[in-house]
């Protein structure tokens, strides 16, 4: 089973890379489960401007960056979206990355880790709404991080509560993916 951990911000000084690293540690060591970091900063996706919706493109993308993104997403069985809350929503770069693809997301399972001044709750709910267009299941357990108390210098300050939330979320994600693959 392969879980893609999507670092959903490309902003300078962002926290998503550090949070994604912490999430990867929470996935590590599980038998039969591997994780891969899908850092949107490394894909350099153009703004969505395809001549037709992705579902109609049949994976025939013109941009090499989109082709690489498509392959990376297609290779995963499920995802953990690590996203900050920007103006009560998801970052534009993450929405753009989601919008570029369609069949690659279909029938896969997702989970969300949000962070922000209000713990990223609104961004997670918006992300769930977006993902339900494609995914079979966006699991309910999530991790909510405060940028004031749970993150310092771009890294998660682990606590017993956060470690428990992460374990609960990853356990749920792995269980749903395993049932789907059975």
Give residue ranges: language-model regions.
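N-terminal beta1-alpha1-beta2 submodule of the flavodoxin-like/Rossmannoid cofactor-binding fold
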Residues: 1-83, 89-93, 156-182
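Helix-loop-strand module that forms the ligand-binding subsite of alpha/beta enzymes
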Residues: 57-135
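Short, functionally important structural connectors and interaction interfaces within domains
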Residues: 2, 30, 40, 97, ...
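FMN-binding flavodoxin-like domain, especially the glycine-rich phosphate-binding loop
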Residues: 106-182
């Amino acid at each position: 089973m392969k879980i893609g951990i999507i670092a959903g911000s490309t902003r300078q000084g962002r926290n998503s890379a550090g949070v994604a690293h912490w999430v990867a540690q929470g996935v590590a060591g599980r038998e039969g489960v591997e994780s891969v970091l899908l850092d949107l900063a490394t894909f350099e996706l153009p703004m969505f401007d395809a001549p037709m919706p992705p579902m109609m493109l049949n994976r025939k993308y013109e941009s090499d960056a989109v082709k690489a993104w498509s392959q990376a997403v297609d290779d995963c069985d499920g995802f953990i979206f690590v996203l900050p809350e920007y103006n009560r929503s998801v970052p534009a770069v993450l929405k753009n990355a989601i919008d570029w693809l369609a069949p690659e997301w279909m029938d896969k399972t997702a989970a969300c880790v949000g962070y922000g001044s209000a713990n990223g709750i609104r961004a997670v709910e918006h992300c769930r709404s977006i993902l339900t267009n494609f995914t079979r299941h966006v699991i309910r357990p999530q991790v909510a991080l405060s940028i004031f108390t749970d993150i310092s210098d771009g890294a998660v300050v682990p606590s017993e509560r956060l470690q428990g939330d992460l374990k609960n979320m990853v356990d749920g994600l792995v269980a749903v993916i395993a049932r789907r693959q059975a």
